[in-house]
Each structure stands twice: as structure tokens, then as C-alpha cells.
UniProtKB/Swiss-Prot annotation:
The keyword Repeat appears for this protein: no
Protein name according to UniProt: Maturase K
GO BP: any one term: RNA splicing
Organism: Collinsia heterophylla
Keyword annotations: Chloroplast, mRNA processing, Plastid, RNA-binding, tRNA processing
Known role: Usually encoded in the trnK tRNA gene intron. Probably assists in splicing its own and other chloroplast group II introns.
GO molecular function, one term: RNA binding
One Pfam match: Intron_maturas2
Family membership: Belongs to the intron maturase 2 family. MatK subfamily.
GO cellular component, one term: chloroplast
Subcellular location: Plastid, Chloroplast
Predominant cellular place of this UniProt entry's protein: plastid
Top-level taxon: Eukaryota
Lineage, opening ranks: Eukaryota, Viridiplantae, Streptophyta, Embryophyta, Tracheophyta
């Protein structure tokens, strides 16, 4: 770690020319291995000296440049003929180390700004929570009218990824190496899946995948930072830091060509400038909401498609960008169905002998549980059928009843915890019912009896932990909340401790 810190303290001119030698430094791969191990409790720590050896890295890169396809190892039929080693072994090796190296130039522009401002980055776990975005949506989206629902494609050509990194990584040798790796990964079908000349990311090599994908997406998202600074009178520190790039300002000069050749740049900028524009990206989707009219949001759609296509080599089919009215559509956001509902409120006002009825329309963001996708997910993991009827889940015979109940209970509590912000709890109750009855049928199947006979024989105490409702959990946490529970439980609750969504497939 100290070697990397000393490297970050070099001058920018030196940093741009010494990325490639870092590939041969053993501490880079040890650092990458330690970071990967610290994030996963399922990995077996066998020691990085057996996997991330400097000698292995040098031999790997030497064979890459020799390009001898006639190397055959009779002892290992699964070895790749080009590299002479197992692709499952070298794929994470070179990708994890290279991801750490190419991330270095992205941190360089942040260092001078933080030193000038003498600011410290405050790490807050609450801001990392998935639920932290929902209060923002409740405060902002209720005042907006239209939204652009953009479906981001994972299919990216390898050369586009290299060109994206070219603005940040000035080392030509590193760019040639990553271009070579992408082409070879295509042949391996381990890092990318080739589809009609483009690359689709697979689930392997997550670190390098996230880096390439986020850098590519941020490249065309950078236009929103510029427009936000032009529309807002408040200074954005991080936007100003990220905009210190020559490539972006060069592309901004072409705004005039999008809407016509007008000499006044501010006139063209006014066509797409909106102080109430909000942008949110999540998974493979991004949302651009505005308070403008339908004509304004249509101009935005045409602008984005044209600008991204001509200046970022990014093709967005117009049919992948949907214009929706918030009050008439349901948006899928992080496992919720959200829409803006208009609730009329009638107020009676009386002045002397005259009385008036005033009707006010109050907009409120409504969050619903997507019952159909959840049932489909439960059906895929064999908790129920496609119609939502609970079924028994095949399990190992050596598992105890308490272990089975604990697994079902954790899944039920996780779903209840995550979907606690739903405004209507009826769909959530149905999911709980499916899991509870599936647990009972699984235990009855294990004991070779019926559900009624098993529950009557075991008693209600057996499922007491699993059947513990949210009311009991709230009472145990806040004993004084009994009097106000009727109001609290029906309202939406956002938890700031949810960092990821548990996958039901992990149930075995």
C-alpha cells in the first residue's frame, strides 16, 4: 500500500508514463488479492504467493508477446493453447491486477482539488444504503411531470472501451495491453461474450468489469455535470473536479451543430437547460426527470440520441428511451414500482356568512411492491410455482429443523426489511404467506407427514422465530412504540443499513 501511495505523489507528467511497469510489480497483485479477499467471506485464503507471483506475471506477459499457438500441455486438457495455462486461473490474475493499475489515473485529478480546499472525504454508511435514494425521489419526483426511462446496453465494442480510457491513461503501452487482453478474452468467452462484433460483460472478473463499465458510462454522463453547473447557481465541488478534462470541453463545442449553426452558444444551451432536471442511474437503467412539458422532454430525447451517437460513439436506439408521464406510468426502481399519485384534498373555508370549498391536488410518490417479479423469483428458486402456490423445497436430509426455519426466516425478514417502504402492504403479506407455507411443507416433507399433522405435532413454538412478525421486532427494538404502532407500521420506513440485495439463489 505504501508503494502505491508514493506513486500517487509523483508529478502528473511522470504518472502518465509509468503505468506499464506497474504490471510487473508483485505488490500490485498482492494488494488486489487482499481487497478481493476482504470483500468475500466465501473465498479460501490460500496465500497470494501461490497465485500472484511476480515470476508468473512475467511468464504470462512473455507468452502473450510470443504468440505461439503450438504450445501443447498433455497433462492438462483444459489449458488454453495460447497462454499454456488454465484460463480460469489467469483470467482473474491479470484482470484484478490491471484494474488496480488503471484506476490510479482516475484518482489523480481529485488530489489537487482536495488539497486546495483542505477538505476531507466523509465516509458515511448511510449514504451507501440503497434506501438512501428513495427519500430523494420522494422530495424531488413529486414536483416533476415527465421522465425519460433509458435502458443502458451492456453490449460495448472493445475499441470503444479503449478509446474511453485513452483520455485518462496516457501510457500507450498500457492501452495496447488492454486492447490485446480484450481481444483474447473474447476468444476465451470468459470476460466478454461476443455478439455481432460487440462485447457483453459476463459475471467473471467483476473488478475490471465494473471499472470499464463505469468509466464508459460516466464518459457520456459527463454532459449532465456540465448542464447542472450551467443551470444551478450553487457550486458543485465534485462536478468541478470531474470536469477538468480537455476532451469534454472539446465535445461541448459541438453543441451548436446539434440544434443548428447559431453563433450564440448560450442560445443553444438554453434549449436543453432545465434547473429542475434530475438524473438517477441504477443497474442497467437510468432516469432523467424534468418539470418541463412534453415538447421539452422530446427535445431532450433527440438531443441525447444525437449527441451520444456522434461524439461518444454510443448508439442508443430511440426505442430504448421511453417518455413517460409520472402521473400515468409505473417506473421500476430498485425492486419497487413507483408513480406520482394525485390526491385531491378538499378544504372548507368560511368568511363571515359565505363558505367556500377549495380543492387542492397534492402530488405524492407512491411506492409499490412488484408482486409478479417477486413471485417469478420465488418460482425460479422453487419456493412456489408460477401461479404463486407454495411448494415444498428439496433439501438435504441432514439439515436440522431449526436450520431450515432459520433460512426461510432470513429470506422473509430480508424481503420485509427491504420492501418496508411500500405504501401498500398487501402484496408483501402475500410473499410472506408463500414463504411461511413453503417452509411448513418443506418440514412436513422431511418428516414424511402432512402440513397439518406436522404443525399439530410440533406445536406453534417450532415456527415461533420464523413467524415473528414485524410488530414484535419493532416492539423489541422500541418498547415505547406500542401506542403509536398503528401509525408507524402503516407508514413507509426507509432503512439506511441496506448495502446490497440478497440473492435468493444462494439458498441451497
Amino acid at each position: 500500500m505504501s508503494e502505491i501511495q508514493r506513486y500517487l505523489q509523483l508529478e502528473i507528467s511522470q504518472q502518465q508514463n509509468f503505468l506499464y511497469p506497474l504490471i510487473f510489480q508483485e505488490y500490485i497483485y498482492a494488494f488486489a488479492h487482499d481487497r478481493s479477499f476482504s470483500k468475500s467471506i466465501l473465498l479460501e485464503n490460500t496465500g497470494y504467493e501461490n497465485k500472484f507471483s511476480l515470476l508468473i506475471v512475467k511468464r504470462l506477459i512473455t507468452r502473450m508477446y510470443q504468440q505461439n499457438p503450438f504450445i501443447i500441455f498433455p497433462n492438462d486438457s483444459t489449458q488454453n493453447q495460447f497462454f499454456g495455462h488454465n484460463k480460469n486461473f489467469y483470467s482473474p490474475l491479470i484482470s484484478e491486477g490491471f484494474a488496480v493499475i488503471v484506476e490510479i489515473p482516475f484518482f489523480i485529478p481529485l488530489i489537487p482539488s482536495l488539497e486546495r480546499k483542505k477538505t476531507k472525504i466523509v465516509k458515511s454508511k448511510n449514504l451507501r444504503s440503497i434506501h438512501s435514494i428513495f427519500p430523494f425521489l420522494e422530495d424531488s419526483f413529486s414536483h416533476l411531470n415527465f421522465v425519460l426511462d433509458i435502458l443502458i446496453s451492456h453490449s460495448v465494442h472493445a475499441e470503444i472501451l479503449v478509446q474511453t480510457l485513452r483520455y485518462w491513461v496516457k501510457d500507450a503501452s498500457s492501452l495496447h495491453l488492454i486492447r490485446f487482453l480484450l481481444n483474447e478474452y473474447c476468444n476465451w468467452n470468459s470476460f466478454f461474450i461476443l455478439k455481432k462484433g460487440s462485447f457483453c460483460f459476463s459475471k467473471r472478473n467483476q473488478r475490471l468489469f465494473l471499472f470499464l463499465y463505469n468509466s464508459h458510462v460516466w464518459e457520456y454522463e459527463s454532459i449532465f455535470f456540465f448542464l447542472r453547473n450551467q443551470s444551478s447557481h450553487l457550486e458543485s465541488t465534485y462536478s468541478r473536479v470531474l470536469l477538468e478534462r480537455i476532451s469534454l470541453y472539446g465535445k461541448i463545442e459541438y453543441f451548436v451543430n446539434v440544434f443548428g449553426k447559431v453563433k450564440d452558444f448560450q442560445v443553444n444551451l438554453w434549449l436543453v437547460k432545465d434547473p429542475c432536471m434530475h438524473y438517477v442511474r441504477y443497474q442497467r437503467k437510468s432516469i432523467l426527470a424534468s418539470r418541463g412539458t412534453s415538447i421539452f422532454i422530446t427535445k431532450w430525447k433527440c438531443f441525447l440520441v444525437t449527441f451520444w451517437q456522434w461524439h461518444f460513439s454510443l448508439w442508443f436506439h430511440p426505442r430504448r428511451i421511453y417518455i413517460n408521464q409520472l402521473s400515468k406510468t409505473l417506473l421500476e426502481i430498485w425492486g419497487y414500482l413507483s408513480s406520482v399519485q394525485i390526491n385531491p384534498s378538499v378544504v372548507r373555508s368560511q368568511i363571515l356568512e359565505n363558505s367556500f370549498l377549495i380543492t387542492n391536488a397534492i402530488k405524492k410518490l407512491d411506492m409499490l411492491v412488484p408482486i409478479i417479479p417477486l413471485i417469478a423469483s420465488l418460482a425460479n428458486t422453487k419456493f412456489c410455482n408460477v401461479l404463486g402456490h407454495p411448494i415444498s423445497k428439496p433439501i438435504r436430509a441432514d439439515l436440522s429443523d431449526s436450520h431450515i426455519i432459520g433460512r426461510f426466516g432470513r429470506i422473509c425478514r430480508n424481503l420485509s426489511h427491504y420492501h418496508s417502504g411500500s405504501s401498500k402492504k398487501k402484496s408483501l403479506y402475500r410473499i410472506k404467506y408463500i414463504l411461511r407455507l413453503s417452509c411448513a411443507r418443506t418440514l412436513a416433507r422431511k418428516h414424511k407427514s402432512t402440513v397439518r399433522t406436522f404443525l399439530k405435532k410440533s406445536g406453534s413454538k417450532l415456527l415461533e422465530e420464523f413467524l415473528m412478525s414485524e410488530e414484535d421486532v419493532l416492539f423489541l427494538t422500541f418498547p415505547k412504540a406500542l401506542s403509536i404502532f398503528g401509525v408507524v407500521y402503516k407508514s413507509r420506513i426507509w432503512y439506511l443499513d441496506i448495502l446490497c440485495i440478497s440473492d435468493l439463489v444462494n439458498y441451497k
